[in-house]
A protein has these predicted regions:
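Extracytoplasmic/secreted proteins, especially bacterial periplasmic and envelope-associated proteins
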Residues: 26-29, 33-40, 44, 75, ...
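Hydrophobic, aromatic-enriched interface-forming segments
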Residues: 38-44, 48-72, 76
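Substrate-gating cap/lid alpha-helix
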Residues: 62-101
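Histidine-centered active-site loop/cap adjacent to the catalytic His
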Residues: 121-174
């Protein structure tokens, strides 16, 4: 059993490079390069272990709770996940594990569930500290915290349980 988490740093690199002109189009070239890199990673992994189930985790939008109105970011994450899934599906014993919804929205945070929320009415309402994603580390509101990792683990385990019969071989017992 092999788990792989890739892609998040690639996305952040594009965001930092294009912070003032960020668009969905900014990610097209980097996504293609990422897909090439992911293909190489999976090929190398498969050369070392031809039978193991490989579970590749998707990425999540850490900005969703505080900025649900930035729809382009959600589109970018969805496109990135689709690009990942496209590569993963080329290997019959590799599986894509989506985590965007469970991390971005899975804790029941009000802002995450209400995407039609009106613009903040006061300076206080716009304070990033007023809304928190309970699945992210409080110090950076970016990386998963214990709750976030538990949610991710649950998604991975659901995928393993659903697919293990395709790659898990029972040892001959004598």
């Amino acid at each position: 059993l092999i788990t792989v988490t890739v892609g998040g740093n690639d996305i952040m690199k594009v965001i930092k490079k294009n912070i003032f002109g960020l668009s969905v189009d900014s990610f097209e070239g980097p996504l293609e390069k990422y897909q090439e890199n992911l293909s190489e990673i999976l090929e190398e992994t498969r050369s070392l272990n031809s039978d193991a189930g490989i579970y590749v985790l998707g990425v999540y939008n850490p900005f969703y709770v505080n900025f649900p109105e930035i729809e382009d970011m959600q589109t970018i994450i969805q496109n990135w996940d689709e690009g990942t899934k496209e590569i993963v599906e080329k290997d019959e014993n590799a599986y894509f594990v989506p985590i965007n919804e469970v991390i971005s929205q899975g804790t029941g945070d009000e802002a995450a569930l209400n995407t039609n929320k009106e613009s903040p009415s006061s300076e206080e309402d716009n304070d990033l500290n007023t809304v928190k994603n309970k699945a992210l580390y409080e110090e950076d509101n970016f990386h998963p915290n214990t709750t976030g990792y538990q949610l991710i683990t649950r998604e991975v385990m659901k995928n393993i349980d659903a697919t293990k019969d395709t790659w898990l071989k029972e040892e001959n017992a004598s």
